């Protein structure tokens, strides 16, 4: 182990490495509160995630019998995956959250019409974590407004750079 890695671990810094991002979620939804959840995975899934074969773009989470499950996320099995189990790419995966967090999320989803959307999948100290966000769907005019604001910010930066360069 190198000196830098030893120093980082000695200082208590948690190393996080992003596995998959859901960039479409920011475009399709207004994201509000974010939660970090663990995932109940099988062995072949962890191995496939280490190989970078995870996709959370089509995924969403829902509450069933007081527990939260991730639906639609795809973990493609490796060819040399376990022979004694049949890997299912898009199976329901249980999310591990504290009871208070589950209750809070459940109330917002049921009463206020929020959706649970996965935004990032990453390693946190040798454990796979999923960041989920409470989200409300954007309508087309909201998406157009966001694009217009983004273009305006870009143009403004361009004008400021040009002005500062000439001055």
Curated annotation (Swiss-Prot):
Disordered: annotated span: 139-167
Gene Ontology biological-process annotations: trans-translation
GO cellular component: cytosol
InterPro entries attached to this UniProt entry: SmpB, SsrA-bd_prot, SsrA-bd_prot_CS
Top-level taxon in the UniProt lineage: Bacteria
CDD domains tied to this protein: SmpB (cd09294)
GO MF: RNA binding
Main localization (coarse): cytoplasm
UniProt cross-references to SUPFAM superfamilies, sorted A to Z: Small protein B (SmpB)
Task performed by this protein: Required for rescue of stalled ribosomes mediated by trans-translation. Binds to transfer-messenger RNA (tmRNA), required for stable association of tmRNA with ribosomes. tmRNA and SmpB together mimic tRNA shape, replacing the anticodon stem-loop with SmpB. tmRNA is encoded by the ssrA gene; the 2 termini fold to resemble tRNA(Ala) and it encodes a 'tag peptide', a short internal open reading frame. During trans-translation Ala-aminoacylated tmRNA acts like a tRNA, entering the A-site of stalled ribosomes, displacing the stalled mRNA.
Family of this protein: Belongs to the SmpB family.
Protein name: SsrA-binding protein
Organism: Xanthomonas axonopodis pv. citri (strain 306)
